[in-house]
């Protein structure tokens, strides 16, 4: 499916646009953009790089290194945004509070934001940060696609059970605000499905093409 998905070729042309410390430093609020969020050490940077076939996000063994909103241009009207991966114990509390305020402001006010990819470590899903993101998405009527990352760390049956359990809890707590799937960057599991969601949000799919959710 990747060969037919226009997002692949578009992402290969991606280039760094700007870093923003707060909402008023973001690029003009026009066109379409998709953001990538996740608690520190949830595999956000690896997922972003795998989906785009590019080294857009800096990966690090030290969680919590992303402290700015990093914008990447795909073309004149489409962007990807790497959101701060705060939540790690070594990140100072004032910094966490600062990013909580600015992240909420970004998610609630950004008209061009078409959706958010939320990375959850399949072994530690629905952290306080994850729940906060789901709350904000529900309040802003913003779609979220959850990647249950590091699925290769569990046996297939255990991974599917974890997915079903989290899906039930998300549906009970937040309704249909989120879709979910298994994902593994090293094994490239779930890449095609996630790329279809990304292409749909960025207006790259024909009207008769729809991403297929994982059962």
Swiss-Prot record:
A UniProt-annotated Pfam family: MMR_HSR1
Signal peptide boundaries: none
Binding-site residues, GTP: 38-45, 64-68, 82-85, 149-152, 182-185
Cofactor: Mg(2+)
Domain called EngB-type G: residue spans: 30-204
A GO cellular component entry from the record: cytosol
Any Gene Ontology biological process: division septum assembly
Highest taxon listed in the record's lineage: Bacteria
HAMAP family the UniProt entry points to: GTPase_EngB
Primary role: Necessary for normal cell division and for the maintenance of normal septation.
Protein name from the UniProt record: Probable GTP-binding protein EngB
Organism of this sequence: Pseudomonas paraeruginosa (strain DSM 24068 / PA7) (Pseudomonas aeruginosa (strain PA7))
């Amino acid at each position: 499916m990747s060969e037919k998905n226009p997002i692949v070729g578009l992402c290969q042309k991606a280039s760094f646009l700007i870093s923003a410390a707060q909402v008023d430093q973001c690029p003009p609020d026009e066109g379409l953009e998709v953001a990538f969020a996740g608690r520190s050490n949830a595999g956000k940077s690896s997922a972003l790089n795998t989906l785009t076939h590019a080294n857009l996000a800096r990966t690090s063994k030290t969680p919590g290194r992303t402290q700015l909103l990093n914008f990447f241009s795909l073309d004149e009207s489409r962007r990807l945004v790497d959101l701060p991966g705060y939540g790690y114990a070594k990140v100072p509390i004032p910094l966490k509070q600062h990013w909580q305020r600015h992240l909420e402001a970004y998610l609630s006010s950004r008209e061009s934001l078409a959706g958010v990819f939320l990375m959850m470590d399949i072994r530690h899903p629905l952290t306080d940060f994850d729940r906060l993101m789901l709350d904000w998405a529900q309040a802003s009527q913003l779609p979220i696609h959850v990647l249950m990352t590091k699925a290769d760390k569990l046996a297939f049956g255990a991974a599917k059970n974890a997915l079903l359990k989290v899906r039930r809890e998300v549906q009970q707590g937040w309704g249909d605000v989120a879709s979910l799937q298994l994902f593994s960057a090293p094994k490239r599991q779930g890449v095609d499905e996630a790329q279809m969601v990304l292409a749909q949000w960025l207006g790259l799919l024909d009207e008769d093409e729809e991403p297929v959710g994982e059962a």
